[in-house]
Amino acid sequence: MLSRESSTLIARYRFAISEYSSTEDHIDEVFRRINSNGKILSKQELRSAGCVSNFSELVRKISTIIRGDTTHSDIMGLNKIHNISICNDGLDYGINIDNHFYIRNHIISRPSIRDSDDEELVANILGYIFLDDKPTSGSTSLDTFYGEGSTSHAIHTRTQLENYIQTNGADKIVNNYLFVYEMIQKLFDANNLNFRSHILGNASSSQECPRYYQAVFLALYELIINENMQLDDEQKFIAQLGD
């Protein structure tokens, strides 16, 4: 227990505080952008900061599992934060993604994952699955999913996303998504194939191909989850996917 003198010193400590007036939305935007090390936040980081919808939580949960954070929890002590960070080369803590399926197959690069582009991929896929009016993939749709826009269309889109989750259940959605993800991973790993090279050809110099992965994922999701079909001949399927 602190002495009375120490407690008094702490209580009398003066903090440097700046005050200014602004609108509530502007203040929220300022706090969304604050970070401890001056890093410029990516578009997806800005979208998810402060967004508490069921959709954003579902995207975060699926992305976290796929990224490899098996110790994920909504509540964590500050001394354990480094354990859920993507580690830098040579460090013995955090999540090592150098051998991740996305990176090995040039679906998403390591820097892009650090910018949460893997969350964008999940959000685009879920948005397409959930919505009757199929959205295009890109910033405009993602901004709408995460709360931007007050038009009737934007509000209806977010309502439909939330209703889909409540109707089908978050756990079921997560399990279905992971089932398809793991199926694609096993198909390419078991056949010693690289996703980018197999889909785009060996001559491709593209460092990433998230949209092609999204197309394959959604096709399998439709057949396996929605139509309850099974993959009978893996080799023929793989051949059909080839360039």
Question: Where in the sequence are the language-model features?
Answer:
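C-terminal subdomains that position terminal phosphate/3'-OH groups for nucleotidyl transfer/ligation
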Residues: 119-243
